[in-house]
Amino acid sequence: MNAWEVNFDGLVGLTHHYAGLSFGNEASTRHRFQISNPRLAAKQGLLKMKNLADAGFPQAVIPPHERPFIPVLRQLGFSGSDEQVLEKVARQAPHWLSSVSSASPMWVANAATIAPSADTLDGKVHLTIANLNNKFHRSLEAPVTESLLKAIFDDEEKFSVHSALPQVALLGDEGAANHNRLGGHYGEPGMQLFVYGREEGNDTRPSRYPARQTREASEAVARLNQVNPQQVIFAQQNPDVIDQGVFHNDVIAVSNRQVLFCHQQAFARQVQLLANLRARVNGFMAIEVPATQVSVSDAVSTYLFNSQLLSRDDGSMMLVLPQECREHAGVWGYLNELLVADNPISELKVFDLRESMANGGGPACLRLRVVLTEEERRAVNPAVMMNDTLFNALNDWVDRYYRDRLTAADLADPQLLREGREALDVLSQLLNLGSVYPFQREGGGNG
């Protein structure tokens, strides 16, 4: 059956700031306390979406979350009106304010793990929300992510959206950032590659930085998504590269159809894994980047592998890269060698995503890949699909509500909270989502 990959990109939120919240993500730590520009960040993301849509790649948008997220501050014992809660937190425990104001939901590669209908036992598209258990600021995302995805994929005959796994370390799940799908045409059954960093009883794990994904979580997600057991491979990421800042697999590997583009040190037991994939995926091609040409450190600093590998109708592929790749002589030299080598990659497309990159999120972090048949695509909420009208409306919306300068101190400003809620109210109407945010359902949550 004919099917296409639709990229659903996260729209950067109004509180995008640099707080260094993500231990193990070296860009996040390095840019802590810098001044951010939320308006520019949102526009950089929108430009990528629009450019790819104009190039013929189906593209949609996932809206930001409500931030600062007052309900969690109340759970932590802060009381009074919303404004009083903000004031108390800023005075007594400012570190919490940064966590509940993080714009990290923009990295929707961590929103969920997707199983296309060609891979599932019941013939539906399945989406399992990620619990993002390893980081407090990200663990807050799952309930609203679930509401948003249910509003976008609202046809229950075609889509099954599953709640996140229990919030315990044993079941730490980071979503599609640790998941690859390999195969022929998108509408054909594919091989799902789940990548984990640790498992119970196995001492092979990183020592410097945390392994966020467990094998136990990956196995549970595969079950929830009803993936045909014959179409699943579980593989461990190389613990040594996690300790070098590869906190998700999409920082060291990216797949598309029959191609796996990865660093030669990406996986534990990589030789065996690639042999297994060759045996089980027709036409499988591994493009392994040697450490002698691109070190793991350079791969992390440029986000070479946090790229999007997209298929054209003629079978060729385009690699979507952050500007940092072009600015690194060694990485750019390798990429130009790749273009003339015998592989499907025939074009490099570079985007300036500096605002997101400084927090450790490149092109692949910003998108959730969903393979859909034509019938399934028609069942998606049409208001989120990118086109000229939506692009212009979202740009105007960003101009109206987003600040062009934000520091950690600004997060305590009650006006920022009010601006954010008004903006999301307007956006949820623009995208025909209904009342997906807690403040919409609770009348603002003042108490």
UniProtKB/Swiss-Prot annotation:
One Pfam short name: AstB
This protein's assembly is summarised as: Homodimer.
Q: Which family does it belong to?
A: Belongs to the succinylarginine dihydrolase family.
Keywords linked to the UniProt accession: Arginine metabolism, Hydrolase
Q: Which InterPro entries match?
A: AstB_sf, SuccinylArg_d-Hdrlase_AstB
Q: Which reaction does it catalyse?
A: N(2)-succinyl-L-arginine + 2 H2O + 2 H(+) = N(2)-succinyl-L-ornithine + 2 NH4(+) + CO2
Stated name of the protein? N-succinylarginine dihydrolase
